[in-house]
């Protein structure tokens, strides 16, 4: 039987975010560990304190196969960006203003590939630092779960582009301001 003062650590990420931690975990030392955890501090995804503390309390088992698969995803993203930089000169075209005189279709393609370049430029560091956290046994939320061209709406784009920050804002700003009950304050 579990002690009423010590809640069980949930395995589900949504539960780990929502469930409060024991009062003694909301200390200055725990806050510093959370704030200065290197994989997430440098350039990793944003993680809620409750999720982080729950995983420190009861470390998750992350199968080596899942970590290896994620490592392959990081490598594929890196090589895809290298391929794009080597064969598609959209960044050079933009910087040198070589797009002057292009047809509207060509301008559209240059713009689209510039967006894809920005996506790669951001997804690679986020995935590398999340991989570092996974190797350390911390399952941080995945950012950019969709490609930029696979967002059906602005809301879908926001929820998937910087997903971990969206979850943090919902947990620490939107819900305390009243959530859907008080949309004027939550704007």
Which role does the model predict for each range below?
Residues 1-187:
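Membrane-embedded transmembrane alpha-helical bundles that form the catalytic cores
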